[in-house]
Amino acid sequence: RTEDQIAKLERVKVDLVAPPMVHKHEQKVGPEPRVVEFRMTISEREIEVDRDGTTMHAMMFDDSMPGPTMVVHEGDYLELTLVNPATNTMPHNIDFHASTGALGGAKLTNVNPGEQATLRFKADRTGTFVYHCAPEGSVAWHVVQGMHGTVMVLPRDGLKDPAGNALHYDRVYTIGEFDLYIPRDEKGNFKKYGSSAES
C-alpha cells in the first residue's frame, strides 16, 4: 500500500497496560487492515527486586518489566511512537521480531534522551514475537535490565483449533520467564550502583 492508501485506513489508538495484563482488543476483525497506534515511554530508574531490599537500575518500556504486550491482527500496520525522556541518560531503540528489515526497526528508532521516533510496519505473519532494545554493542545489557516485551499477531478471522473450529478466550495474560542479573561483591552481597550507566 502507498502512504496515501495507508492514510485512509481506520486508526485505532491503544492504551497499553502492564503485564501480566494485556490491553483490550478484538479477537476477530474484518478484512480491511487498520493502523494500530501505540505509544511507549522508556524509563530508567532504580527498582526493588526482592523482599530483602535488593535493587537494580532498570531500563524499561512503559515502566514495566517485561514491557507491555501489543496485540494486532495479520495485515494491520503496527505504529509505535517510542519516547526517550530528557531525564534519561542513555540512547535506546526497539527491535520488533514481528518485523523485517532495519533490524526489526532498531536502526530506525534510535532515540537519545529528549527524543522520540515513530515506526510503522505491516504485521504480515501471525504468532507471538519478542521485542527488545537493541543498541549497537549493548543489546544483552539492555535486555537483562528489563527492555523486552511481546507482540501478538492474531489471524484476522480469529484463532482456530487444528480442525479449523473457532477458538475464543475469556482472558489473556502475558506469561514468560526471565532472570535478573545483579552481581555480588567480594562479601557476597548484591552490588548497588548509582545509575544504569554504572551497572
Identify the role of each PLM range.
Residues 1-92, 96-103, 108, 113-116, ...:
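N-terminal, post-signal-peptide metal-ligating segments of extracellular/periplasmic oxidoreductases
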Residues 28-29, 41, 164, 175, ...:
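Non-catalytic, glycine-rich low-complexity segments
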Residues 35, 142-148, 170-172:
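Short edge beta-strand segments in beta-sheet-rich domains
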Residues 42, 151-155, 177:
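Interdomain boundary/hinge segments at the C-termini of tandem beta-sandwich modules
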Residues 43, 83, 134, 177-180:
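Active-site-proximal beta-strand/loop segments in catalytic clefts of secreted hydrolases
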Residues 48-50, 141-142, 161-162, 183-186:
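Short helix/loop capping segments that flank catalytic or ligand/cofactor-binding pockets
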Residues 79-92, 98-161:
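Extracellular/periplasmic metallocenter environments
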Residues 169-199:
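Acidic-aromatic/histidine active-site loop/patch
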